[in-house]
A protein has these predicted regions:
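Residue-level signal for well-ordered alpha-helical segments
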Residues: 7-11, 25, 59, 63, ...
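Glutamate identity and glutamate-enriched acidic tracts
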Residues: 3-5, 23, 35, 44, ...
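Exposed, low-complexity/repetitive linear segments and helix-based recognition motifs
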Residues: 8, 55, 80-82
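Negatively charged, low-complexity tracts enriched in Asp/Glu with abundant Ser/Thr
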Residues: 1-39
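Acidic, low-complexity intrinsically disordered segments
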Residues: 62-103
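A short, structured beta-strand/loop element
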Residues: 29-67
């Protein structure tokens, strides 16, 4: 099972973590998350994954509260959406998170 994992620094206080596993060319497991550094700690802000056997998006506020959104997508499409969404919207998500809102 080929595995791919990397971390991309988006700014001094923002990074994207990407992990996925393929089997016979299909995504069988993935996590893509936006992390923001606050008070010298990295905190997850947005996490796309397939835990619980379905693709979903977890949105966190600065207090650690979570909202879960079912994506109703296969893992390949969810992984593409996750990468694109974080690449395009991380600055907006960071701003909302630091204000105390859900991104």
């Amino acid at each position: 099972m080929p595995e791919k994992q990397y971390l991309i620094l988006l700014d001094i206080d923002a990074r994207k973590r990407h992990y996925h596993v393929t089997e016979t060319g299909k995504i069988i497991k993935f996590v893509v998350q936006l992390e923001i550094k606050t008070a010298n700690m990295w905190k997850e802000v947005i996490r796309y994954d397939c835990a619980h056997d379905y693709a979903h998006k977890d949105c966190y506020n600065i207090r650690g509260q979570c909202r879960k959104i079912n994506l109703y997508l296969d893992y390949e499409d969810a992984l593409t959406l996750a990468d694109d969404d974080i690449n395009e919207n991380w600055e907006i998500y960071r701003e909302k998170f630091l204000r105390g809102d859900f991104p």
